[in-house]
C-alpha cells in the first residue's frame, strides 16, 4: 500500500490533477461565466504608453495592478481570456505543491491542500468585480514564500528581509499577507534557535518600510499604503471567501505540519483523493451558485451590441430575454439600428415602458446612455455622455470608441485622431482604430461607410437646446430639424406605443408615406386596429394599406379575448400564450 501511495503522488499525478482542475476552470469561465471576464474587460482600457505605466509606478501595488490590467485586456477574447483566468487560478496549486516539498518531504497530505487556494479563487473570480490583479497578488505571495522556504541557510533569510520592501512596492497590501505567513512559519512551524530574532527583525522591517513609503516616497494616504490593492468588495459572501483565503495562507505552515502529522500511517490513496475531489466539487457548486443568468444575458447582449452585431443581439434577447432595464434598452437600440423598432418592439420583453428607450442622465447609466443619442444622430450629446464617463471612470474601450466616432462625425478630425491614437496603443482595438484613421486622412470615405455615412445623414440641420432632464422631448425637435430621420421618428412612435398613447401614435401614420414608407410598421397597424375597434371610425392612414395579416391576427385576438375573459383569473395567462408578442397584449395587460 505504501508503494501504491508513493506512486499515486508522484509528479506526473500532481501534474495530471492540476491539468484537470485547469480545464475545469477554463470550461467554467469560457462556456458558463464568461460574462464575468467580458464585463471586466469593458471596465478599463490597457494602453501601451509610458504615462499609463507611470501612473502605476507612483504607488505600492501599482505593478500588480498594471500586470492585472495588461492581462485583463485578453478577456476580450473568450478563449484567450478564459485561458489566462484559469492559469492564474490554478497556479497557486503548483506553488503550494512545491512549498509542501520544502516544508516536509514525501507527505501525501499536500495533494488535497494544494487545491484549497485555487478553489477559493475560482469562487471569488465568479464575482464580476474580482479583478485579475487580485489573482496575481495571491500568486506573488505564494511564489515569494516559496523563495523564502527554498533554503534554510542564513543568506536566504537575509535576502527575504532585504527584498521585503521591494515586495511591498510591487504587491502592496499582499506583502502583509506574506509577512504574516512567514512569521507563522519561522515562529510556529520552523521554531529554530534564532526564530524570535528573525521574527522581530521582519516586524521592524515592515514598520520601517511603512514609514518610509508613507512619509518619504509616496503621496498616497496611509490606508492605501497598507491595503492597496487588496479586494474589499461590498459582498458578504465574497468577503467571507477572501477572509478564509487570507487566514488559510497565513496559517498554512502550521496547518500543513499539523495535517502531515495526523496523516502518518494512513497512506491509502482514497484518504487523500476524496478530500481533494470534495474541495474541487465544492468550488464548482459554489461558483455555479454565484452565477447570475440575468447578468450573464445582459453582458452577452452588450458584447453583441458593442461588436455591431445587432441582428444577433435581437435574436439573443428574444430567445433568452433579460428582464432588466439595461437588457431591454440595448434590445430596443439594436432594433433602432436595424430599422425594426416599430416592427419588432413587442417580440421582446417590454417591462419598463418608455424607460427602456432612453436612459436618464446620471452616474448609474453613464456608460450606456450615449447609444440612444448616437442612434438618432445627436452626436454632440452622445459625445458628452461618453466624455463624462471617461472623466468619472477613466479610459474604457467603449467610451474612447464613442468619442472617436462622434468626433469624426462632427468633423473634428484632430480630436478624433487623439482618441484613435489611444486605441492604436491597444491589442484588440488597434485594427478598428487604423480603419478610423484612414477615414480621418480621407474624409470622403466617411460618406460611403456603412455606419458613418448613415449617421451623417441623421445629424440635425438646425440647432436646439438638448433637454437632458426630459430626453424624450428631443425627438420632435430632431424630427422637425431632419424630417428624413426615420430612426428618431420610430423612437418617437415606439415611445407613444410604450406609453399607450394610441391616439397620437395612430394620427402619425398619415405622415409615413411622405417620409418614404411603403407600408405601415406592424405595431402601428395594431394600434390603428385598436383605434378602429374602439371608435368605429377608420383612421387616416395616409394612403398606406392595412395588411391582411394584421387584420386576421386582430380577429383571432378579439375572438380569443372574448372567450378568455369569462374567467378573469386566467385571462392574462391564456392571452399571453398566443399573443404575448402583440401590442394588444401589452395594451391590455402591462
Annotate each predicted stretch with a short phrase.
Residues 5-21, 104-109:
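N-terminal membrane topogenic signal
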Residues 13-38, 205-213, 281-287:
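Transmembrane signal-anchor helices characteristic of membrane glycosylation enzymes that use polyprenol
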Residues 26-80, 86-88:
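Membrane-interface coil-to-helix junctions
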Residues 57-61, 81, 85, 108-155, ...:
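Membrane-interface micro-motifs in multi-pass membrane enzymes
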Residues 129-132, 150-192, 196, 204-216:
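Transmembrane helices and adjacent periplasmic/lumenal helix-loop junctions
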Residues 193-262:
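Membrane-embedded alpha-helical segments of integral membrane proteins
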Residues 266-292:
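Internal/C-terminal transmembrane anchor helices
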Residues 287-457, 461-463, 480-501:
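Soluble catalytic regions of membrane-associated enzymes that act on cell-envelope
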Amino acid at each position: 500500500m505504501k508503494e501504491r501511495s508513493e506512486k499515486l503522488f508522484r509528479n506526473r499525478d500532481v501534474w495530471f490533477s492540476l491539468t484537470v482542475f485547469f480545464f475545469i476552470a477554463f470550461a467554467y469561465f469560457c462556456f458558463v461565466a464568461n460574462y464575468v471576464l467580458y464585463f471586466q474587460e469593458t471596465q478599463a482600457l490597457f494602453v501601451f504608453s509610458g504615462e499609463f505605466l507611470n501612473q502605476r509606478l507612483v504607488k505600492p501595488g501599482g505593478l500588480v495592478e498594471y500586470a492585472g490590467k495588461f492581462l485583463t485586456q485578453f478577456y476580450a477574447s473568450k478563449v484567450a481570456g478564459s485561458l489566462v483566468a484559469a492559469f492564474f487560478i490554478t497556479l497557486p496549486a503548483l506553488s503550494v505543491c512545491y512549498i509542501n516539498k520544502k516544508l516536509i518531504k514525501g507527505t501525501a497530505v499536500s495533494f488535497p491542500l494544494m487545491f484549497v487556494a485555487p478553489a477559493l479563487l475560482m469562487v471569488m473570480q465568479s464575482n464580476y468585480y474580482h479583478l485579475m490583479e487580485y489573482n496575481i497578488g495571491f500568486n506573488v505571495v505564494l511564489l515569494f514564500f516559496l523563495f523564502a522556504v527554498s533554503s534554510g541557510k542564513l543568506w536566504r533569510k537575509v535576502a527575504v528581509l532585504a527584498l521585503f520592501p521591494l515586495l511591498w512596492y510591487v504587491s502592496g497590501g499582499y506583502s502583509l499577507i506574506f509577512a504574516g505567513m512567514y512569521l507563522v512559519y519561522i515562529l510556529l512551524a520552523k521554531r529554530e534557535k534564532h526564530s524570535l530574532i528573525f521574527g522581530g527583525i521582519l516586524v521592524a522591517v515592515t514598520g520601517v518600510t511603512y514609514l518610509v513609503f508613507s512619509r518619504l516616497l509616496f503621496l498616497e494616504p496611509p490606508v492605501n499604503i497598507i491595503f492597496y490593492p487588496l479586494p474589499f468588495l461590498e459582498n458578504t459572501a465574497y468577503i467571507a471567501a477572501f477572509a478564509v483565503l487570507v487566514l488559510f495562507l497565513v496559517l498554512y505552515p502550521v496547518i500543513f505540519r499539523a495535517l502531515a502529522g495526523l496523516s502518518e500511517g494512513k497512506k491509502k490513496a482514497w484518504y487523500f483523493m476524496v478530500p481533494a475531489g470534495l474541495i474541487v466539487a465544492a468550488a464548482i457548486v459554489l461558483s455555479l451558485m454565484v452565477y447570475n443568468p440575468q447578468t450573464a444575458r445582459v453582458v452577452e447582449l452588450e458584447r453583441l451590441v458593442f461588436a455591431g452585431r445587432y441582428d444577433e443581439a435581437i435574436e439573443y434577447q428574444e430567445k433568452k430575454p433579460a428582464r432588466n432595464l439595461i437588457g431591454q434598452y440595448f434590445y430596443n437600440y439594436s432594433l433602432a439600428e436595424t430599422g425594426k423598432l416599430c416592427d419588432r418592439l413587442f417580440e421582446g420583453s417590454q417591462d419598463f415602458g418608455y424607460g427602456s428607450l432612453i436612459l436618464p442622465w446620471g452616474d448609474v447609466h453613464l456608460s450606456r446612455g450615449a447609444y440612444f443619442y448616437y442612434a438618432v444622430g445627436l452626436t454632440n450629446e452622445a459625445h458628452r455622455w461618453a466624455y463624462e464617463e471617461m472623466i468619472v471612470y477613466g479610459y474604457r474601450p467603449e467610451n474612447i470608441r464613442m468619442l472617436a466616432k462622434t468626433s469624426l462625425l462632427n468633423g473634428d478630425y484632430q480630436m478624433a485622431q487623439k482618441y484613435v491614437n489611444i486605441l492604436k496603443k491597444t491589442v484588440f482595438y488597434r485594427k478598428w482604430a487604423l480603419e478610423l484613421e484612414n477615414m480621418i486622412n480621407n474624409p470622403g470615405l466617411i460618406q460611403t461607410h456603412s455606419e458613418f455615412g448613415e449617421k451623417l445623414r441623421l445629424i440635425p440641420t438646425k440647432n436646439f437646446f438638448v433637454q437632458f432632464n426630459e430626453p424624450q422631448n428631443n425627438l420632435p425637435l430632431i424630427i422637425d430639424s431632419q424630417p428624413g430621420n426615420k430612426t428618431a421618428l420610430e423612437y418617437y412612435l415606439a415611445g407613444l406605443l410604450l406609453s399607450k398613447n394610441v391616439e397620437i401614435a395612430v394620427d402619425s401614420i398619415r405622415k409615413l408615406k411622405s417620409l418614404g414608407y411603403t407600408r405601415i410598421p406592424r405595431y402601428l397597424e395594431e394600434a390603428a386596429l385598436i383605434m378602429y375597434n374602439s371608435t368605429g371610425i377608420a383612421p387616416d392612414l395616409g394612403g398606406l394599406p392595412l395588411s391582411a395579416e394584421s387584420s386576421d391576427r386582430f380577429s383571432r385576438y378579439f375572438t380569443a379575448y372574448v372567450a378568455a375573459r369569462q374567467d378573469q383569473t386566467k385571462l392574462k395567462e391564456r392571452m399571453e400564450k398566443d399573443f404575448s408578442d402583440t401590442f394588444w397584449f401589452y395594451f391590455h395587460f402591462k
